[in-house]
């Protein structure tokens, strides 16, 4: 069983900008699957996400509000079935919450700007940080670098 990252639950507004919309507004903006995962804390099936095997250079941003969350330099293949990163873009990008669902104790990660569910963070990552940010592909959009 993966070790759980014990981070102090926090809410940090990214660049002082917080995105707030009603469920109705989110439903108009997002696909059914995006809404289920991002707004209702769902999970996409493992090995099904379009960004799982993406190896291009760029920034992974929030599907809901386009806030930058992760960079390609921090992405790695953990074998878990979801895109994995060893660190977020910065400490202000992510909100951490205790998740007691499904009979487990985990640390949920959300976008700090719009509170979108991203996935979970575990302490079984690579030696660089020891952390694995396990993220649903549907929670992310990829912005390719011009390089």
From Swiss-Prot:
Residues 1-25 are annotated as: Disordered. It comes from the Bacteria. Residues 23-145 form the MsrB domain. GO terms for cellular component: cytoplasm. Binds 1 zinc ion per subunit. The zinc ion is important for the structural integrity of the protein. Disulfide bonds: none annotated. It is an enzyme of class 1 (oxidoreductase). Pfam families: SelR (PF01641). Belongs to the MsrB Met sulfoxide reductase family. This is Peptide methionine sulfoxide reductase MsrB.
């Amino acid at each position: 069983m993966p070790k759980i990252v014990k981070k102090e639950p926090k809410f940090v507004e990214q660049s002082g900008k917080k995105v707030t919309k009603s469920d109705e507004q989110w439903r108009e903006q997002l696909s059914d699957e995006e809404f289920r995962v991002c707004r209702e804390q769902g999970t996409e099936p493992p090995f099904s996400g379009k960004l799982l095997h993406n190896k291009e250079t760029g920034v992974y941003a929030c599907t809901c509000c386009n806030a930058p969350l992760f960079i390609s330099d921090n992405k790695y293949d953990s074998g878990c079935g979801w895109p994995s990163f060893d660190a977020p873009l910065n400490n202000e990008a992510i909100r951490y919450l205790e998740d007691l669902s499904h009979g487990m104790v985990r640390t949920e990660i959300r976008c700090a700007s719009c509170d979108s569910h991203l996935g979970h963070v575990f302490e079984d990552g690579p030696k660089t940080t020891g952390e694995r940010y396990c993220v649903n592909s549907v929670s992310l959009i990829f912005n390719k670098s011009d390089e």
